[in-house]
Swiss-Prot record:
It catalyses: DNA(n) + a 2'-deoxyribonucleoside 5'-triphosphate = DNA(n+1) + diphosphate. Residues 1-90, 179-198, 906-931 are annotated as: Disordered. Signal peptide: none annotated. Heterodimer with the terminal protein; this heterodimer binds to bp 9 to 18 of the genome. Forms a complex with viral pTP, DBP and hosts NFIA and POU2F1/OCT1 for initiation of replication. GO terms for molecular function: 3'-5' exonuclease activity; DNA binding; DNA-directed DNA polymerase activity; nucleotide binding. Belongs to the DNA polymerase type-B family. Its EC number is 2.7.7.7. It holds the Pfam family DNA_pol_B_2. This is DNA polymerase. The gene is POL. One of its GO terms (biological process) is viral DNA strand displacement replication. Residues 30-40 have a biased composition (Low complexity). GO terms for cellular component: host cell nucleus. Eukaryotic-type DNA polymerase involved in viral genomic replication. DNA synthesis is protein primed, and acts in a strand displacement replication. Assembles in complex with viral pTP, DBP, host NFIA and host POU2F1/OCT1 on viral origin of replication. The polymerase covalently transfers dCMP onto pTP, thereby initiating complementary strand synthesis.
Amino acid sequence: MALVQAHRARRLHAEAPDSGDQPPRRRVRQQPPRAAPAPARARRRRAPAPSPGGSRAPPTSGGPPASPLLDASSKDTPAAHRPPRGTVVAPRGCGLLQVIDAATNQPLEIRYHLDLARALTRLCEVNLQELPPDLSPRELQTMDSSHLRDVVIKLRPPRADIWTLGSRGVVVRSTITPLEQPDGQGQAAEVEDHQPNPPGEGLKFPLCFLVRGRQVNLVQDVQPVHRCQYCARFYKSQHECSARRRDFYFHHINSHSSNWWREIQFFPIGSHPRTERLFVTYDVETYTWMGAFGKQLVPFMLVMKFGGDEPLVTAARDLAVDLGWDRWEQDPLTFYCITPEKMAIGRQFRTFRDHLQMLMARDLWSSFVASNPHLADWALSEHGLSSPEELTYEELKKLPSIKGTPRFLELYIVGHNINGFDEIVLAAQVINNRSEVPGPFRITRNFMPRAGKILFNDVTFALPNPRSKKRTDFLLWEQGGCDDTDFKYQYLKVMVRDTFALTHTSLRKAAQAYALPVEKGCCAYQAVNQFYMLGSYRSEADGFPIQEYWKDREEFVLNRELWKKKGQDKYDIIKETLDYCALDVQVTAELVNKLRDSYASFVRDAVGLTDASFNVFQRPTISSNSHAIFRQIVFRAEQPARSNLGPDLLAPSHELYDYVRASIRGGRCYPTYLGILREPLYVYDICGMYASALTHPMPWGPPLNPYERALAARAWQQALDLQGCKIDYFDARLLPGVFTVDADPPDETQLDPLPPFCSRKGGRLCWTNERLRGEVATSVDLVTLHNRGWRVHLVPDERTTVFPEWRCVAREYVQLNIAAKERADRDKNQTLRSIAKLLSNALYGSFATKLDNKKIVFSDQMDAATLKGITAGQVNIKSSSFLETDNLSAEVMPAFEREYSPQQLALADSDAEESEDERAPTPFYSPPSGTPGHVAYTYKPITFLDAEEGDMCLHTLERVDPLVDNDRYPSHLASFVLAWTRAFVSEWSEFLYEEDRGTPLEDRPLKSVYGDTDSLFVTERGHRLMETRGKKRIKKHGGNLVFDPERPELTWLVECETVCGACGADAYSPESVFLAPKLYALKSLHCPSCGASSKGKLRAKGHAAEGLDYDTMVKCYLADAQGEDRQRFSTSRTSLKRTLASAQPGAHPFTVTQTTLTRTLRPWKDMTLARLDEHRLLPYSESRPNPRNEEICWIEMP
């Protein structure tokens, strides 16, 4: 076919067939016109101008008359005789392929013929040869790659090269030599079988083929080319490389880096406005039972209360009555169960929860069936099922014309501090994978234990949502709202939530923080425990527990007076325990309502999301809620119009996840003075350190491609090489990034006890003044190190990440919380203040969340993808645990004893045909007792369980690939938050130690003795320096807590924590003792202004603080300093060992055992600092190296 101009104006038609031979590369030819026509236009046609008389103009001389575009005669012309119309395009003769040679990694350009038969025929004609007679062009036209070798054998070229195209543009070259065989024999005989010509009649020129899948093409030529390493474009001499193409290749095409950064998924913070909720708030009381696994805690009492939507509350109340629960006399919606029988409480609570979720699931199913009356007929006609409940979910979703309004039901099992105790104690009984719900439900489960607690234990029963569709307008999402179309399923969700995870404090303190009424008094739980263990407890004449069961005398007197006011003659310990437990449940239920209303009001008013139906219990922790609010604020500000946060805020994944995590370094915590300090000591604390750091600029935008990254890294290195010239943290020419660095410290006289960076090279995190090698640091750390006199060198690393710009991405979030906190202080709203404070401190923790490749599933909950991963070797089962079987229904055969005679014992070893004598005695019989010659066997009880192994087996799965897939958390923001805090402390160090530069460390005065993450303990000299050089950073003198982009500078404030309780002035401790990190005591606080004295401060992490005081810690230090090994100091406390899933033989899943931990109190032994003298410590340096460092270097010996 060819594009040919017609012999009349502005018409195109096909070229007439030409039977003559034409050259292989026939170009599109234009026939010479009889008369020069007007230039043709491709997209526009015009009729000739009409003549004045109204008739058409005569045809051009020398050519046929021009016909009109549409006339009556053309309509009557048969289609076969009409002239063809339109554009005719000649097919291409050759194709072009740009590939990579797998053997040499060389980029190539392969030009190949599209028509194999025609190209091979013409090639033979050019070389004056012919194709073999048994190889027809039709056979070549229909040939696929599986017959290529046979064709080559028929052609018998000297050599045939075959380029096979693989994945991602990689080709593999192979060669066939038909005249040679691997066994050394010739091919002549084999060729004769395929080709009648003599052996010498083969092709005399080599061939080259290209195999693409099953298609075979003849290669015209193969030329080496160049390939751009930044954009992957192939070129011969030069090319233009655009930044857009480089970025696209780096983030989406390059197999090595395309999965380094993932878009963060987003869904609005609000829940569906029509969600129906039921809250079951409960609490349990336990006693100690000596079992096979130690002191195991067994529940003997459970109290629960219902709340939420009125129809669901009524249904739950009626169900509790039907199942025989006792109603608490003071509240009609509170029920309880009391029994000391082991496992009885768990079984009864499990039964209630199973029946409740089944009741709600059937309610959802009934509404679905009512909305789809054609369901029953369709199930019968399509699947032959008499009941729709026999359908599976996969079958149900194929139901045509699903109708109805979707419903969303949520059942919350709520308690205070239940995830670490109550839910574990009850879990072996209440976790029931099988429930009598209709078959069409899609059942999924999210079970996640973490750090000895059940973080998630959610079950979802889902049905198809007829209104689900992909969202195109995201205006509602920007306001935090959602509607029917945003949910793929309508569902019932059963979730376990812990109010402790949302308050981070005890129930009594939480009630005070949220302005809830708190009942005075408490219960003597030690007496209750002894009562259930031994059957009695020590009491007074009226049954009231004696003083030893109470915390102290004051608590004993208070509770006795409260009981006396009730006017009861005899103390009923069980009833009193029930009342206290029920009151705790009432307070927890009120706390649930308060949290729901307060957080919803905060999101609506403070955050400004008026369309968001926010439910704080939708997410289990305060950290997850803070991260959801942050994502919503970013989505509202950026308006990405997609289901993620857009390309500007990404999450590091795979190799980059571990690389970024390496730059996350915890805070400092160590003393630089050990022993007793008898001079004034002040404690300064940074105000909202993480909140202030969050307001500072953070990296923003997709990471730069390697070309732009190299330019940015060069700009950084040039700035770092200018020694003596400080770098501004907010220099717009230097882009944010994460680098691999080497750093060398200045002279030791220029160092101080607060190093600017820390290292894990020795196995432990050490704040060190040693040289740094191969450390991963942020660009903020580069400035901090450089400004402190360190020489910093950037190490080339392909994982180095540079971002295109800075952005105060979390500033609005922090400002909202600070404004809410200030408003709460003015209005004296303790609830709002607690919420703002928690959310302000929790966001950084959500950024730093550490992910892994492990998950814990029940055996019968492994989906098809998980099973496929296990069989393919991509997932390993690290361990398996089995639950206790007491919760399962069982039939027990009691112990029994049987006696056998010697003849009967012989029958046991005989063959079957020898035992067919009917006169022989029955093998199992009971002979008279004491019969001689008989042997007695005692059989232990046998338990037959009504359960499958999937109900009891808990698997810990781990992916073989160690790389973490992350699309949730922007972990690099946590790196920069911590880097900004290190910049704060570095500036603080300048206030204290800049005047000492040049003086040897051992000759410097003592200015600070202890440093924590956000605090510093300073002496009188350090206090004076803070009041002079650091005055602008003291909160009482004014200052900002929020970074101002218009006036960029480090923004942080401190305040003196040791203040006088009488006048509010700064106070000091006249004497202190320091034993180890987080193990110190301040004897007292003295105010120099008014002379008042108050109680000191004691910190003893891991120890029972109530058993320690200042004098004990002083005695401990002196005993150790004087070498008194006989005198040992220790503290003891009761600890609960929680086991959820463990491969240890001595730990049983879902058990809580009580143990007593005894810790030795002693000064710091395994120090991460170098000792300067008897008391003073200094960070490691070149003259005082870290003894733990064992760096390995490659040295070649001559």
